A protein has these predicted regions:
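Short, acidic/small-residue loops that bind anionic groups at enzyme active sites
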Residues: 136-142
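Acidic two-metal-ion nuclease catalytic site recognized across multiple nuclease folds
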Residues: 1-18, 189-219
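Conserved non-catalytic scaffold segment of RNase H-like nuclease domains
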Residues: 2-131, 138, 157, 165, ...
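Acidic, divalent-metal-coordinating active-site segment for phosphoryl/phosphodiester hydrolysis
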Residues: 176-188
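Short alpha-helix plus adjacent loop in nuclease-associated cores
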Residues: 130, 142-157
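Short, amphipathic alpha-helical segments that act as regulatory/interfacial helices
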Residues: 126, 185-192
Length: 219
């Protein structure tokens, strides 16, 4: 469950044995766009994008919604993302958009969320829910940066496009939530393949590599 004070009744997935092969897992790879980085202050969510990964395949099951931030979008953010006030004027409010996203996650039967620098995206959602008195219970989640840190520990930067080029994976429209989710998904699948080539083939291996504890199994 994601919410405690106001329950919307969504279930992410079920408990999984630690020896579950990575190839048998499914993931929701997601990204957000916001009016800025100060989401704990006045910046707001303006887009959610996601794609479903089944095993080691990026599917065509995509989710996208703009979000009405109930404030102006700074010009520099419009220049960066291409999102204009007309795009969000009739878009759902944040909680409604997050609710739709969680319906998508549930439909996919996802075993966890994935993102590139995912901590920021989770913070964006958490702050939006807190504004409406919802409590956010973070989902089982994996960050491509943690996988990269294991596979290539000498690399220390966050740029998604840099890593996609380095690992030879597809690059989609940048600073678009769907585009970045697709870029992240293809990078994630390649990183999983590299893990498998090193003998890391199970959920337990993935948890160890990304420094997750057993709380992942308490869904």
């Amino acid at each position: 469950m994601f919410w405690k004070k106001k329950s919307l009744g969504y279930k992410l997935a079920c408990e999984l044995p630690l020896n579950t092969p990575i190839r048998d897992l499914s993931f929701t790879v997601m990204d957000t766009e916001a009016t800025g980085f100060s989401v704990g202050a006045g910046d707001r969510l303006i887009e959610i994008g996601a794609v479903h990964v089944d095993g080691l395949s990026v599917t065509d099951h995509i989710f996208q919604t703009y979000v009405n931030p109930q404030r102006a979008i700074p010009e520099k953010i419009t220049e960066l993302t291409g999102i204009q006030k007309e795009d969000v004027a009739d878009a759902p409010a944040a909680v409604e958009a997050i609710e739709a996203f969680c319906h998508y996650v549930e439909q996919c039967g996802s075993n966890g969320w994935v993102g590139h620098y995912l901590a920021f995206d989770l913070l964006v959602l958490k702050k939006e829910l807190q504004r409406e008195k919802y409590s956010f219970n973070e989902p089982p989640a994996f960050d491509t940066l943690d996988l990269i840190g294991f596979i290539s520990p000498s690399w220390d930067m966050r740029d998604l496009e840099h890593y996609a080029r380095s690992f030879g994976t597809n690059i989609y429209e940048r600073h678009s939530a769907v585009g970045d989710a697709l870029t992240t998904a293809h990078l994630f699948v390649e990183l999983l393949r590299l893990l498998e080539s090193q003998g890391k083939t199970t959920l337990n291996d993935l948890m160890v590599v990304t420094k997750k504890d057993g709380s992942f199994l308490s869904l």
